[in-house]
Amino acid sequence: MYFWEGGYQRALEFAQWKQSRGEIKEPMVLGAYIHLGRCFDLTDTWATTQLGHYYSRLASLLHREGEPIPRNRRARPGDHDLLLRNLDCAVLNFCLTQLAADTGKGRGHFQTVRGVFVEGEPAYPGARIHSRSHIQIAVRDPACILGYFLPAGGYTVSEE
């Protein structure tokens, strides 16, 4: 399960985008109390160093098997951002699986993954701060979700 950290408006925009694609009926945002537990935190240089290492291992493995390396892609022609993160997802999953195997701790070694995603246009000319950037948390172990809530000013949950 994926969550935006403190990003109500961005989460709502995502839900509205899903509605426009016919993937959901009613957009809404649900908050969650999350205990990060053993977190693979992509804002920590240890984690990004691991990703670089395991990317090399994955690339070598795919090359030996004659498989292409996945690529991050735009969702639609004309999109500025590479929203379809096939490469990032493959590297993260390979890295986490291999770290668990290498340490003998099994799949549950990392319960959550936390990272910054830079998206949108620059906030002002010359900026490296972008209009749709957000922190996202992937919860791999549902036990890390301690509870749910409706954010202040948010939509109500329908009875359907």
Locate the predicted segments by residue.
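Extended catalytic/binding region for NAD+/ADP-ribose chemistry, centered on the ART fold
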Residues: M1-K18
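Cytochrome P450 catalytic domain signature, combining two hallmark sequence patches
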Residues: K18-V29
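Active-site and NAD+-binding cores of ADP-ribose-processing enzymes
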Residues: P27-E160
